[in-house]
């Protein structure tokens, strides 16, 4: 009994403490005035008049959604020449993501998986990088994770409120970044496939209403996105210098799993080993629990990598290390269920040994 009491207290401490730890750790990264090139671009966009901001984004690769949010938040924080407010918005969206892990993942799965979800998120270097990055990736991570979790919630027990949350989260995601749009599209395809395979006919109406609404709301910017992509293909000089190589793939792994100074070979090997071991546990969890939700989530991320690879090999190199980041919440869920299954299997074997 004493052991169970101590163990329960430990899980409760982790469940309540990890979001606080994330806020303290990631919050430290926003207390700086240093900006890299893309962050400086975001800062310059915030200083523009509203009409000029919209006009420039029409010729850029991204919609004005993030820059509008950033401009509003920056001025609410007092503006000025200090950049902490720009970074703080990313930190707050990352905190929102952690709270999704704390409450929503716990509701849909259990507290143990929720703790593992938050723990892996806190330990992955890419999360610390993007938490202090004045770009749209933290915002996209929040909205795409909410999209995925609300979809599973709808699958379990559909309500009008859940469909509204799912639709709004999807709109927020597609307006964040082009690759967030791609990931949302792929997730919708997989979600529809699950609806058909599982004969969930009662979900088809809500699915198409949501999909049509997202498409309608995004349609003004879809034309801009397609035009930009066509122009990039048309005026590409065909140089292989801009195409992805094996080193590019290794660099993506390094960005996800390590700090800048870590030797790239070690990072790739250990990162892939971690992924394989946890994937083995996750597949076992899916089979034992007859629940493919984490597999659908991870499949979305994997398909995004394939799409990015094709674009990188045929058009020009995509920076998939950060472009795929909005889907990292799906990967963390996959890791969480995998680790939960591995620990459960280990405990089961220990009981047999000592029985």
Task: Give the positions of each predicted feature.
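Membrane-proximal helix-loop-helix interfaces that form the catalytic/acceptor-binding platform
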Residues: 13-344, 354-355
């Amino acid at each position: 009994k004493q052991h169970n009491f101590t163990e329960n207290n430990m899980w409760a401490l982790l469940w309540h403490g990890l979001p606080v730890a994330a806020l303290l750790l990631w919050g430290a990264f926003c207390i700086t005035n240093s900006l890299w090139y893309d962050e400086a671009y975001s800062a310059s966009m915030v200083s523009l008049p509203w009409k000029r901001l919209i006009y420039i984004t029409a010729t850029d690769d991204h919609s004005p959604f993030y820059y509008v949010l950033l401009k509003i938040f920056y001025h609410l924080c007092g503006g000025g020449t200090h950049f902490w407010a720009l970074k703080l918005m990313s930190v707050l969206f990352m905190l929102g993501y952690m709270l999704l892990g704390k409450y929503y993942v716990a509701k849909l799965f259990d507290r143990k998986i929720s703790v593992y979800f938050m723990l892996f998120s806190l330990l992955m270097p890419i999360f610390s990088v993007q938490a202090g990055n004045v770009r749209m990736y933290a915002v996209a991570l929040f909205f795409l994770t909410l999209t995925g979790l609300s979809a599973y919630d709808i699958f379990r027990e559909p309500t009008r409120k859940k469909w509204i949350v799912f639709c709004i989260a999807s709109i927020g995601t597609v307006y964040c970044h082009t690759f967030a749009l791609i990931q949302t599209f792929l997730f919708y395809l997989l979600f529809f496939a699950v609806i058909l395979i599982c004969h969930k006919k009662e979900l088809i109406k809500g699915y198409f209403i949501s999909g049509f609404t997202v498409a309608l709301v995004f349609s003004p910017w879809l034309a801009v996105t397609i035009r930009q992509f066509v122009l990039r293909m048309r005026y590409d000089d065909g140089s292989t210098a801009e195409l992805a190589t094996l080193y590019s793939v290794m660099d993506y792994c390094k960005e996800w799993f390590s700090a800048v100074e870590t030797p790239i070979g070690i990072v790739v090997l250990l990162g892939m080993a971690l992924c394989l071991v946890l994937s083995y546990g996750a597949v076992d969890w899916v089979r034992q629990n007859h629940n493919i939700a984490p597999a659908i989530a991870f499949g979305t991320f994997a398909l995004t990598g394939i799409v990015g690879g094709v674009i990188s090999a045929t058009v020009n190199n995509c920076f998939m290390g950060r472009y795929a980041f909005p889907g990292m919440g799906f990967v963390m869920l996959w890791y969480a269920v995998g680790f939960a299954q591995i620990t459960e299997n280990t405990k089961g074997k220990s009981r047999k040994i000592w029985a």
